[in-house]
Amino acid sequence: MVQSPPPPAPPDSSVVKVSPTTAQTSGDRARFAVHMTLQHKGGVTKSFCANCLAQYYQATGRVASVLDADPTNKTLAAYKALNVRSVDIMKDDNNIDTRKFDDLIEAFVTEDNDFIVDNGATNFLPFISYLVANSAASILADNGRRLVLHIPLVGGEALNETMVGFDDIAKAFATDVQIVVWLNEAAKGVISLNGKNFEESRSYERNKGKILGLIRVPYHTSELFGQDMETILSKKLTFAQAIESPDTRLMSKQRLKQMQREIFEQISAVI
């Protein structure tokens, strides 16, 4: 069984404070949630999405078990400040270890807290197949848990592949899921589909009933924003750690606070 991590330390003054919205404290959103990052292509910021979610939970004093289920690249687990637990649900033949996955689902429905689960590209197909074949989303819903799938889209050459991934995931889950689309323009450029934004696409129109919300990671014209973000990602630092560090220059701290605020405010509005 997966055990809950210890409650996070009280947030420090460097962290942007976000108050819960009305939507977060009423109706469906009051139930425990299982957040999973999914995308069939590697290197498209899945771990970044999980990382930001975990930081948001920590900053707002909400409790979540943060799990890294990527069998090959334990990116999220490298963030020591986030109390990430590495879980191994794959066998040597790259198939799901059903017993371990059963235990994971059991933890989702018995532990009284949210979960954040980061998945990799290599376990994408077996992971999806298990969830669908075992009606995992319905099981979670029947036990008062929401399954929230976080799907990143990035610009540039990877846009079409990530759009295909989004369509495949949305199609695989007919009911009992909510989808959060991360439009990460900071990673590989502006997300534009034949001159149209994502909200004007056929993919969005087909699946908007399942979409809980969009989180846009904006592209900043000043390359210094990108450099500051790359620094904390390469050093596996949270926003709070970097902002509090005496090694971080004053204007870098200001840019990091701005990026943190942009992301956290959108997470607050969505989840």
Which residue stretches match the model-derived regions?
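Amphipathic coiled-coil/heptad-repeat helices and related helical stalk/stem segments
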Residues: 50, 97-101, 162
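Glycine-rich phosphate-binding P-loop
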Residues: 36-51
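NTP-binding/hydrolysis catalytic cores, primarily Walker-type P-loop NTPases
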Residues: 227-271
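Nucleotide-state-sensitive switch-loop elements of NTP-binding domains
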Residues: 26-36, 59, 63-124
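Short amphipathic alpha-helical segment that frequently serves as the phosphate-/nucleotide-binding helix
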Residues: 47-52, 163-167
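Conserved catalytic-core segment of NTP-binding enzymes
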Residues: 123-227
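Extreme N-terminal, non-catalytic leader segments
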Residues: 1-36, 103
